Amino acid sequence: MAEKRNIFLVGPMGAGKSTIGRHLAQLLHLEFHDSDHEIEQRTGADIAWVFDVEGEEGFRRREAQVIADLSEKQGIVLATGGGSVQSKDIRNHLSARGIVVYLETTIDKQVARTQRDKRRPLLQVDDPREVLENLAETRNPLYEEIADVIVKTDEQSAKIVANQIIEQLGF
């Protein structure tokens, strides 16, 4: 890989973007970044606090700035937030500045992977499955729209998925 290409991971919460991203970056000797973690670093607060104080709109503004900044770098793997693709500007940034990999997963797997995670503000409701179904309906077409590669993450370990991505990208 002569040119340092960026790899942007998109997909719903619970797809494994952060875990797979770390493995992928390590295997390819690239920097790993997580947009949610970067927001927390910049604000000095967790995502739930940002949602509580600034609402989803404030969070999305911060997310757009973080992704714009990070996507300017070269040679990174970036795990994006599940809702980041709702912004046309973010979709354009990602498409123009690297390879977009959509990590696809089922609602059942999302529920299993996120059920005990209290750091996901959108799922702190009585019926998280319904929320995930509604999000999938609006977001999945957006993930597909910008994806250069689609990889299913349900039945594989993060290491195996990272290797599948490398294989599909021809690295």
UniProtKB/Swiss-Prot annotation:
Keyword ATP-binding in record: yes
Free-text remark on how the cofactor is bound: Binds 1 Mg(2+) ion per subunit.
GO molecular function, one term: ATP binding
EC assignment: 2.7.1.71
Pathway: Metabolic intermediate biosynthesis; chorismate biosynthesis; chorismate from D-erythrose 4-phosphate and phosphoenolpyruvate: step 5/7
Assembly with partners or alone: Monomer.
Family (UniProt): Belongs to the shikimate kinase family.
Record protein name field: Shikimate kinase
Organism of this sequence: Shewanella denitrificans (strain OS217 / ATCC BAA-1090 / DSM 15013)
